């Protein structure tokens, strides 16, 4: 949740949502991060028995897809709705503006997974 929140902070445009005129970035984080937590939690329950390396990459892809979805929704509500963006322009802007935050946060997320896997293996061997 922390990495997802960081990703949203890095991506989200400043300003308020045009839906209610008062929702800020923290509101967006509180809206999407519980969903991310549930996705990761369910994934870990379903794929826990699978110890194959592909499982963690699938998790990273799921999280990345969720972040892009959240970025699109928030971009649409905080920036595009105040202007005249087509759906294609929204998608292009979201992908372009998501590159750096998503790369930074996916790398951090991966390093967290790697750290906890190594720690778990070390604890088993001790």
Language-model-derived ranges and their functions:
Residues 10-31, 70-98:
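Interfacial non-cytosolic loop connecting adjacent transmembrane helices
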């Amino acid at each position: 949740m922390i990495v997802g929140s960081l990703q949203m902070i890095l991506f989200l445009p400043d300003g308020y949502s045009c839906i209610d005129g008062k929702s800020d970035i923290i509101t967006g984080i509180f809206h999407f991060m519980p969903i991310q937590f549930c996705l990761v939690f369910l994934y870990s329950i379903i794929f826990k028995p699978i110890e194959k390396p592909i499982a963690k990459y699938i998790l990273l892809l799921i999280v990345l897809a969720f972040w892009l979805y959240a970025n699109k929704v928030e971009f649409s509500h905080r920036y595009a709705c105040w202007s005249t963006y087509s759906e294609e322009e929204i998608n292009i802007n979201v992908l372009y503006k998501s590159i750096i935050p998503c790369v930074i946060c996916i790398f951090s997320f991966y390093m967290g997974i790697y750290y906890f896997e190594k720690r778990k293996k070390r604890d088993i061997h001790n």
